[in-house]
């Protein structure tokens, strides 16, 4: 009893929701054995006959090829294609293929030579001694793909399964009407199919191997049972006929009771499924060493005189196969590649046979009925009841029609297997599968565009990050390469900072002078003497380096004297307006006096060392002397009228007096050394004398009209008087040194006499004013 229950549980099957029972129409083609078809004159081999990218071409136009020779290289998920016969490559160009869009794809066109010569074949009869990776690579390089309709590369599928596969399922259901390719293959080649199953089991090492076959194939079932009579590792499961029990998810649930998760794969639950035709192709690739160059194709339909199953070479035009089967087309003949529910209508008959071509259906006008007009959905829910994937086709229809991609995705449109059960039961004749296919294509295009945008954004962000890193590295290099100050520069900087700190410390100590006491100026005097010594040393260095040819310009000296007078006036005015509360710093006064004395000595020494190369113009000297005398008279008058209330700073007066004395000595020395070599033009002298008289008259008039309220600075007057005396002495010396050959101009003498008279009058007037 326990063994009976165990056997019952072992052979138990489950049923899925939905499904339909359309007319099978399989008896038209499953009664005749497989047969060969004569070779076509031309073969068109598309480079992409599988899910994934097309391979890389390894032939060119004009090449001679043999049957089984690779036309492309298979790398990664790229599956190679092989020459179906021997011949010559005449073209490599786009050609329409078996696709609902009828778009052209790159194809290799071969003209057959009729010899059908194979490449050297190397079979692995001892495949059990081969490593798993070697077998998978051989299957992949021999171009084996899923022949049940998906076209997924078998080698990639086996590689992805790895060691987690517990159940290997062989799909022999072949549930769609009209199609009998797998049925006939199992009847005629059952032993080869089982051998291919054993190779797959050797690669995957599953715990159990299940063959699922519908009960409408009695001959195939009997042939498989005969082959599996002595095998205990492979179980044959006969399931009820129901469409679409051949779907991967549906058959997995029927045989194991496990459901593939949404968005997942069967390998996630430890299940891997392969088709009967794929198992046969694996056997031929591994044991016989033959790449996939042909497959079984069902030729059926009332428009075909000799329906049946044939071995069709890949790349054979559909027209060639139909004509060989006695095709009798009508006026509006339709040819479907695949079954009536999941197949596609061919745009023309030059489309080639590919790896996923399992049936060519040529129905008559009465066989499928007249096409019905599409009507509005009445929401009868018949499509939802028939859906084997538990979807809501009516809702997906509305979302697809309204371009509501997000809602269609939310309602799991990706789980639709496009079986056509919903369209079969729809009373409104709505081609639901067409809407779903279009919606899936649009969603795939949107996701592809989003992926490109994300990749572009990632590249942009990576570029920005790289630029930022390069910028930071560049700045770091610049910082590290910056020139550091030398040791001597650091010492100089440190010394300067020390001096500044010392001065700041001295400035922060207030100087307090008590009444009746004299401050202790010993430190100040010592510092002053040190500075004086330093200044003398610097002056000696400068004198040694200066060129002996340096000439002192008396005009520059006069300008400097004028600038000194202006500064003196400004300081006196500021001191006069200053508040009496301001204290006088004795240290600063001493420093200024020392600086003035040093400048005076410097000027005297420069005057002594200057060479007398510069020539002095006696005419200019005469004019300057006259101007100086006029300014002296003006200053004397201003001093007489000056108010006695203005205070005088003795320090500044001493400084200015010292500077004036030095400048006067310099002028006297220059005048003494000047050579009167330049001849005097009597006309220029007359002009200058006239100008001097005019200036003298203007000065007398200004003095007469001057207001007595104007205050005169006695210090400035003293300085200017000293300068005037120096200039007068200079003029006298120049006149004394003049050569006797120079003629005396009577006009010049007259001018001088006039100037003397004016000066005498002015002196008398000033004397009277002073006495008053």
Curated annotation (Swiss-Prot):
Belongs to the 4Fe4S bacterial-type ferredoxin family. RnfC subfamily. [4Fe-4S] cluster 1 binds at residues 377, 380, 383, 426. The keyword Magnesium does not apply. Residues 599-748 are annotated as: Disordered. GO terms for biological process: electron transport chain. GO terms for molecular function: 4 iron, 4 sulfur cluster binding; electron transfer activity; metal ion binding. Pfam families: Complex1_51K, Fer4_7, RnfC_N, SLBB. Residues 369-397, 407-436 form the 4Fe-4S ferredoxin-type domain. The gene is rsxC. Part of a membrane-bound complex that couples electron transfer with translocation of ions across the membrane. Required to maintain the reduced state of SoxR. Disulfide bonds: none annotated. It is a peripheral membrane protein. Its cofactor is [4Fe-4S] cluster. This is Ion-translocating oxidoreductase complex subunit C. GO terms for cellular component: plasma membrane. [4Fe-4S] cluster 2 binds at residues 387, 416, 419, 422. It comes from Shigella dysenteriae serotype 1 (strain Sd197). Its EC number is 7.-.-.-. It is an enzyme of class 7 (translocase). Binds 2 [4Fe-4S] clusters per subunit. The complex is composed of six subunits: RsxA, RsxB, RsxC, RsxD, RsxE and RsxG. InterPro entries: 4Fe4S_Fe-S-bd, 4Fe4S_Fe_S_CS, Ion_transpt_RnfC/RsxC, Nuo51_FMN-bd, Nuo51_FMN-bd_sf, RnfC_N, Soluble_ligand-bd. Keywords: 4Fe-4S, Cell inner membrane, Cell membrane, Electron transport, Iron, Iron-sulfur, Membrane, Metal-binding, Repeat, Translocase, Transport. It is found in: Cell inner membrane.
